[in-house]
Each structure stands twice: as C-alpha cells, then as structure tokens.
UniProtKB/Swiss-Prot annotation:
Its main location: membrane. The gene is KCNJ1. This is ATP-sensitive inward rectifier potassium channel 1. Residues 1-77, 178-391 are cytoplasmic. In the kidney and pancreatic islets. Lower levels in skeletal muscle, pancreas, spleen, brain, heart and liver.
Length: 391
C-alpha cells in the first residue's frame, strides 16, 4: 500500500470514527437526558391529550358507570375483549348453575335414581357439564334437540324466557360496542396528517405562520373547518397566574377557513399582524418563548357522515423561522396531478424579516418616503402673510 492510499484509508477511518462517535453521543444524550430536556406539551403530535386527573371523589367516579356506553367505547381493546369474553362465559356458566339447581331441586339427576315414569324439568341433564351445555345452547339458540325443557316445571319455563331475553341484550350490547369501536371516526382521523414543523415566512407581502395538512384518503371531509389555540402561561393585571391560557389563532387558506376543498394537501397560514400573539416575537427570541400551538381540523366523513376532529401541536422548537414548504404537487404527462409526500414536511430556507414589527416598520418608512417626507412628527401648516412679514 503506497503513501497516498494509506492517507485516503486513514482519512476514511477517521471520518467513520467521528461519525459513529457523534451518533453514539447523540443517542446517549437522547436516551438518558432527552426526557428532562423535552418541553412539556398538552397535546401530543398524534392528538392525544397529556393530562391527568387527580383526587377525583368516589361519587365522581361512579358517573363513569352511569354512562356505561361511553365508558365501554373508550376502553382499550384488551379490556374490551376481556369484558366481551367474560360477559358470555360468565352468563353461560351462571345460568348453567341455575339449570343445575333446578334439576337438583326437582331430583332429576341420576344420583337421585328417579323412577321410570318421572318427568324431569329438563331432559338429559345429568350433571353440571350437561347443564352448562344446555345453558350455552339456550342462550346462543343452537338448539341441538338432545336437551329440552318440559312443561313439568314453571320455574324452568320462566328461567328459559329470562335467559333468552338476557342473552339478546348481552349480544346486542357487546356486538354493538365492538362495531361502534371499529367504526369510530377517530380512526378516520388517523389518515389526516400535519407537517412535522410549522414555518414562518412572507406570503403575499405579509409575515405568516404556515402549516401543511394532507388527507391521505381520496374520500373527502365535508364542511372542514380549521382553527388553532395558543396555550401559554399568562399573568393577569390582578396578579393571577393562568397556566393554560387559551388564545384564538385564526388559520385561513386562500379561500377561507371553512368548507375546505380537501382533495390535495393544503398549506394553511396565520397572518402575523398587530392582533397576532406572535407579533412581538422575533427569530432570535422564538426558542425562549413558552407556548404550545394546538391546531384543530373538524369535518364530516363523507362515507359515514360521522363528525371527526384531528389535532396536533407545535412547540417553539418545531416552529422554523425563515423557511417555507417545498412544492409537492406536480402535473404528469398524462394530465394527472401527482402529490409527492416525500417532500411533505421538507422545508426550504428563504429570506425573511427577523420580526413582524420590523416588517411593518419598514412598510411605514417606505410609505412615508413615497409621500415625500420621512419624519412622522412633521406637520405641514399653512402660513399667512402678516404686516410684519410683508416686504
């Protein structure tokens, strides 16, 4: 190996070693110290609310059982399937015990040695196992025909009617809960995605905060409406500290903020003017701010007519000042419009004023210079000739 090849090899080894060390250090910092450095947020990127209720009284907890339908729908799948299986197995075994008790009280079991002309309440129940099988056949209406109720016992007839009615109720409730869980519009909201970052740049001569949102399905959202809430800690003039103070943020598209034609990805924007809470922020102080921007998208699912809401949030580290989104819509040779989701969250750096106040002050200066004066306090007054000023 000559000297030049050895130098190239040494350089390659050094670059690879530095790269591996850099990634290892980044992983260690993220793994062991990242959680302490992360900013707390109320709404996660996928729309889940990070909130915990403490010291809830027992009476308040009982309300969840009063509204049992919503409680069952909100349960996780593992708990729901546990309740589903337990409800059926428990009811079958419970009524199996009742059928066994009826046969035991009426002395229909073989251990009582019934006579040849003895008519049992239920034919062919010889023990707890056969009683359980009869309960199963009755509730799910299998009807094999080997075991059946006779007209000998009114108790058995009443128990048969009661189990049949209760079985229909259990079937309706549990199957309805499973179907409602599957068809909830919350799953449709998973196919609506927001850009990873929000950007701040000029648009139409105004400084705007822009966010990109896309519908991954071809079916539309009817009557879509988009808006935002800025959550921050504020102190009132009376000295009260409000931890999660909510400030309305108006987002618009070129056509407005309601009834969006959501067939392709949209770039929504908020104009940073004198009424915007972002007006006094600057590129240098953005990361020092303590706020969370929560964005909501409400709409009606076209296929099911169910109303759904999609939400996400952005913290200061996820707002890029001086960037805009890269184009993602193009036209093919066949005349179709193609959306490239590879560039969905990709941003491009552009020249942007470092604060909104600077942009509007610059516009005021240009307007004054265009009118012929640059002193905002200068007032042109009419002067009349007097006897002292006449020549």
């Amino acid at each position: 190996m000559n000297a030049s090849s050895r130098n190239v090899f040494d350089t390659l080894i050094r670059v690879l070693t530095e790269s591996m060390f850099k990634h290892l250090r980044k992983w260690v910092v993220t793994r062991f110290f990242g959680h302490s450095r992360q900013r707390a947020r109320l709404v996660s990127k996928d729309g889940r609310c990070n909130i915990e209720f403490g010291n809830v009284e027992a009476q308040s907890r009982f309300i969840f059982f009063v509204d049992i339908w919503t409680t069952v729908l909100d349960l996780k799948w593992r708990y729901k399937m546990t309740i589903f299986i337990t409800a059926f197995l428990g009811s079958w075994f419970f009524f199996g015990l009742l059928w066994y008790a009826v046969a035991y009280i009426h002395k229909d079991l073989p251990e009582f040695h019934p006579s040849a002309n003895h008519t049992p309440c239920v034919e062919n129940i010889n023990g707890l196992t056969s009683a359980f099988l009869f309960s199963l056949e009755t509730q799910v209406t299998i009807g094999y025909g080997f075991r059946c109720v006779t007209e000998q016992c009114a108790t058995a007839i009443f128990l048969l009617i009661f189990q049949s009615i209760l079985g229909v109720i259990i079937n309706s409730f549990m199957c309805g809960a499973i179907l409602a869980k599957i068809s909830r519009p919350k799953k449709r909201a998973k196919t609506i995605t927001f850009s990873k970052n929000a950007v701040i740049s000029k648009r139409g001569g105004k400084l705007c905060l822009l966010i990109r949102v896309a519908n991954l399905r071809k079916s539309l959202l009817i009557g879509s409406h988009i808006y935002g809430k800025l959550l921050k800690t504020t102190v009132t003039p009376e000295g009260e500290t409000i931890i999660l103070d909510q400030i309305n943020i108006n987002f618009v598209v070129d056509a407005g903020n309601e009834n969006l034609f959501f067939i392709s990805p949209l770039t929504i924007y908020h104009v940073i003017d004198h009424n915007s809470p972002f007006f006094h922020m600057a590129a240098e102080t953005l990361l020092q701010q303590d706020f969370e921007l929560v964005v909501f998208l409400d709409g009606t699912v076209e296929s099911t007519s169910a109303t759904c809401q999609v939400r996400t949030s952005y913290v200061p580290e996820e707002v890029l000042w001086g960037y805009r989104f890269a184009p993602i819509v193009s036209k093919t040779k066949e005349g179709k419009y193609r959306v490239d989701f590879h560039n969905f969250s990709k941003t491009v750096e552009v020249e942007t004023p470092h604060c909104a106040m600077c942009l509007y002050n610059e516009k005021d200066v240009r307007a004054r210079m265009k009118r012929g004066y640059d002193n905002p306090n200068f007032i042109l007054s009419e002067v009349n000739e007097t006897d002292d000023t006449k020549m």
